[in-house]
Design a protein with these regions (language model features):
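A structural signal for well-ordered alpha-helical segments within the folded catalytic domains
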Residues: 106, 110, 182, 208, ...
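Short, conserved phosphate-binding/catalytic loop or strand-edge motifs used
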Residues: 160-167
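Short, surface-exposed recognition loops and adjoining beta-strand edges that mediate ligand/DNA contacts
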Residues: 62-78, 163, 196-212, 225-269
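TPR/Sel1-like alpha-solenoid repeat signature
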Residues: 140, 211-217
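Bacterial Sec-dependent N-terminal signal peptides
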Residues: 1-30
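Conserved, well-structured interaction surfaces
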Residues: 41, 45-58, 79-154, 168-182, ...
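Short coil/turn linking the two alpha-helices of tandem helical-hairpin repeats
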Residues: 151-153, 158, 199, 220-229
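Membrane-proximal, proline-rich intrinsically disordered regions
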Residues: 20-66, 71-72, 94-96, 246-249, ...
């Protein structure tokens, strides 16, 4: 009798534990995660949305003016600690804006890489190929723009395409500025070919946005290279030579012409 009671109790306990385990095992339907987030075209659009705002803040806040218009002497602000050092050519490694801008650009790079790789690895079967290509193009637009700034302002930069892998590889030699800008051009060329002609929402980039930025990047390469398409060795050393690489000047003209003639833009009345 005791043995029967023991067997019944054991079976009852097993059933209770099994039912409890089933009750406690549920799929995550509320918190976003890599495995389940990228399940619709709208989710991909949401994944690239952050690339338009906060990641740029530390650059746009002050450094945009000091390192851009300030250094070009388009503005002056003698009593400004974050503009005057640049207009007066007295900035140092500790000058306001430098570290913030560097961090901001690499935040853009990191988040763009995350978007590209997560979409590639975790997109569900319901996601259309068109939505994936559009998302890749938006992320590469932002990454390319950040790398153009890095190459132009520091003349060196660390190029990488997988943020998760980079975390485990903290010592990486910097690439030459011209190589960084070449990488940026490749990103923008991809964006120009694959972005839509019209924005899906106000403020989103289009193919004409990419062609406009490309025109500016080609002008940079016209001064950094001597003749023909960049091949790793035709790097200019005399920046006062009085001429520019006509290959990239022509590329810049074509990209700008495409925006002017085909884009939905017009001069103000």
């Amino acid at each position: 009798m005791k043995n029967k009671i023991l067997i019944i109790a054991t079976l009852a306990g097993s059933l209770v534990l099994s039912s409890c385990e089933d009750f406690l095992t549920h799929d995550n339907t509320t918190s976003a995660n890599q495995e389940t987030f990228f399940d619709t075209d709208e989710a991909l659009e949401a994944a690239t949305a952050p690339l338009y705002n906060y990641v740029w803040n530390s650059f746009n806040d002050k450094a945009y003016y000091s390192m851009g218009d300030g250094r070009a002497n388009n503005i002056t602000a003698r009593w400004s600690d974050y503009i005057y050092p640049y207009t007066n050519f007295t900035e140092t490694a500790l000058s306001p804006g430098l570290e913030d801008a560097w961090g901001s650009f690499y935040s853009v790079v990191a988040q763009s890489n995350y978007a590209i790789n997560n979409i590639k690895d975790y997109s569900g079967p319901q996601v259309s190929e068109k939505a994936k290509v559009q998302a890749y193009a938006e992320a590469r637009f932002m990454r390319g723009l950040a790398y153009w700034y890095i190459g132009s302002l520091w003349n060196k930069g660390i190029i990488y395409e997988n943020t998760a892998e980079q975390v485990n590889n903290s010592v990486v030699p910097a690439n030459r500025g011209v190589d960084v800008i070449e990488f940026a051009i490749r990103d923008l060329e991809y964006a120009a070919v694959n972005l839509s002609k019209t924005a899906s929402d106000v403020g989103r980039v289009t193919c004409y946005s990419a062609y406009a930025i490309l025109s500016r990047m080609y002008l940079s390469m016209a001064g950094l290279t001597t003749e023909g398409e960049y091949n790793g060795s035709n790097i200019a050393t005399d920046f006062n030579r009085g001429s520019r690489n006509t290959y990239y000047l022509d590329m810049a003209r074509k990209a700008a012409t495409k925006v002017i003639e085909e884009g939905p833009y017009s001069l103000l009345d």
